[in-house]
UniProtKB/Swiss-Prot annotation:
Gene name tied to this protein: mnmE
Protein name: tRNA modification GTPase MnmE
Residues given in the record as (6S)-5-formyl-5,6,7,8-tetrahydrofolate binding sites: R26, E88, R127, K463
GO biological process, any: tRNA methylation
Record-listed E.C. numbers: 3.6.-.-
Cofactor binding mode and count: Binds 1 potassium ion per subunit.
PROSITE patterns: G_TRME
Domain of life: Bacteria
Residues reported to bind GTP: 234-239, 253-259, 278-281
InterPro entries linked to this entry: G_TrmE, GTP-bd, GTP-bd_TrmE_N, GTPase_MnmE, MnmE_dom2, MnmE_helical, P-loop_NTPase, Small_GTP-bd
Role noted for this protein: Exhibits a very high intrinsic GTPase hydrolysis rate. Involved in the addition of a carboxymethylaminomethyl (cmnm) group at the wobble position (U34) of certain tRNAs, forming tRNA-cmnm(5)s(2)U34.
The family this protein is said to belong to: Belongs to the TRAFAC class TrmE-Era-EngA-EngB-Septin-like GTPase superfamily. TrmE GTPase family.
Listed GO MF terms: GTP binding; GTPase activity; metal ion binding
GO (cellular component) term, any one: cytosol
């Protein structure tokens, strides 16, 4: 594993670009103080106490031109995010001053950090394991308080502790197998029986199954619930989107076909992050642009975790309504009867022949009635008994982790199959070792450089 001395000193802007109260430029590496002292006018930062904030100015040493008035936060290794020497320069927000300071840092010994490189160093230097490093990005991207709480639990190491406990259990079994193989002549050595190996495989598999039982909810919390709002034109889809978002994101008019494309937005519905997709009204049309929007709408239905099918309660069912009801029959859906503020003309008896009325919710987006009930129903559909968790309040949210847990589970099934077939214990232990290795990939106890490059490239600059 690389050590801090093998790394260049890196720098990046940690705050979003644009105007703001402050901007932060982060520097990390063994040459941090050599770089900063060349451009910082004030106290000698190489001598100040760690974890202090120091007032001063950034000055171009070549022109002696003052660039900005700043506060510099000094943090010495190893008690930093990267376990390297770190300085964070807080300057006035804005593109010009921030970029000028960054360029001075880069021209005096640092290089530009790659996306996620600060967190990558935290992993390589042993401050975080891989699952904790991934939780950093989950925390940044959290859309709801529930998402944030799950990410914080993972960052605190809850998942890591459980995985390492399982790996240690497996390692203990493998050690006993090795002793039994290497020293079969010693009667005092505890014999690893087929029964004992089977019991341990069953025990670990139960823990993995408990983790996997949280995966569905966890994936929703991490990635959001892809929710398609569909219906024929002018039934109130865009009005529903705007109401859920509490802002006018979609154009609302009486003209059918106004929404020509798919609009995507995230919204927090009682702790459930919904990735709302407002689709173009689905109907037969000769308009080329609208036709493209309709085709995208149909694709959105296929990709959705939840379909909100909006019908107009003030109009009789149309052939397009019936087609959409049939097309979404196998989808997880809620059928919304909108415009209940107007006289009802939709035949409820006919609707009952096409859909289970328990899936139907009446509402008037215009009068803001029924929206609370819609939010309650969505939350109940996916979190009926609240947030599931396994031992120690652990939830699995990451698709990579889910895949590795399934591979570990399969390896344990192979152990059971081998034992049932009467295979020698020394052969069965190969599958037990595979399980141990798959679990190790979750925490990064075993990894490939290509995996690290792929994971950390998804991070933002400065993190």
């Amino acid at each position: 594993m690389p050590t801090t001395t093998e790394f260049d000193t890196i720098a990046a802007i940690s705050t979003p670009p644009g105007e703001g109260g402050i901007s932060i430029i982060r520097i990390s590496g063994d040459q941090t103080f050599n770089v900063v002292t060349q451009i910082f006018k004030g106290k000698d930062l190489s001598r100040v106490q760690s974890h202090t904030i120091n007032y001063g100015h950034i000055v171009d040493p070549d022109t002696h031109q003052e660039v900005d008035e700043v506060m510099a936060t000094v943090m010495r290794a190893p008690k930093t995010y990267t376990r390297e020497d770190v300085v964070e320069i807080n300057c006035h927000g804005g593109l010009v001053a921030t970029n000028e300071i960054l360029q001075l840092i880069l021209s005096h010994g640092a290089r530009m950090a790659e996306p996620g490189e600060f967190t990558k160093r935290a992993f390589l230097n042993g401050r975080l394991d891989l699952s904790q490093a991934e939780a950093v990005m989950d925390l940044i991207r959290a859309k709801t308080d529930k998402s944030m709480k799950v990410a914080l639990n993972q960052l605190d190491g809850d998942l890591s502790k459980l995985i390492r406990h399982l790996r240690q259990d497996i390692l203990d079994v493998l050690a006993q197998v090795e002793v039994n193989i290497d020293y079969p002549e010693y009667d005092a050595v505890e014999t690893m029986t087929t029964k004992m190996l089977k019991e341990k495989a069953t025990e670990v598999a139960q823990s993995i199954n408990q983790l996997l039982a949280t995966a569905k909810q966890g994936k929703v919390l991490r990635e959001g619930l892809a929710t398609a709002i569909i219906g024929r034109p002018n039934v109130g889809k865009s009005s529903l989107l705007n109401h859920l978002l509490h802002e006018d994101k979609a154009i609302v008019t009486d003209v059918a076909g106004t929404t020509r494309d798919v609009i995507e937005e995230y919204v927090n519905v009682r702790g459930v992050p919904l990735k709302l997709v407002d689709t173009a009204g689905i109907r037969d049309t000769e308009d080329k642009v609208e036709k493209i929007g309709v085709e995208r709408s149909r694709k959105a239905i296929g990709a959705a975790d939840l379909v909100l099918l909006v019908l107009d309660n003030s109009q009789p069912l149309t052939a397009e309504d019936r087609e959409l009801l049939q097309e979404t029959d196998q989808s997880k859906r809620i059928v919304i009867l909108n415009k209940t503020d107007l006289p009802a003309r939709l035949d409820q008896a006919e609707l009952a022949q096409l859909v289970d009325l328990s899936d139907v919710l009446s509402m008037s987006v215009l009068e803001q009635s029924g929206v609370t009930q819609l939010e309650q129903r969505i939350a109940k559909m996916f979190f009926n008994e609240g947030i599931e968790s396994s031992q120690n309040n652990v939830m699995v949210t990451n698709a990579r982790h889910i895949g590795l847990l399934n591979q570990a589970k399969q390896a344990l099934q192979d152990v059971q199959t081998g034992l049932a077939a009467g295979m020698p214990v020394d052969l069965v232990q190969i599958d037990m070792t595979r399980c141990w290795e798959f679990l190790g990939q979750i925490t990064g106890d075993s990894y490939e450089d290509e995996l690290l490059d792929q994971l950390f490239s998804q991070f933002c600059l400065g993190k």
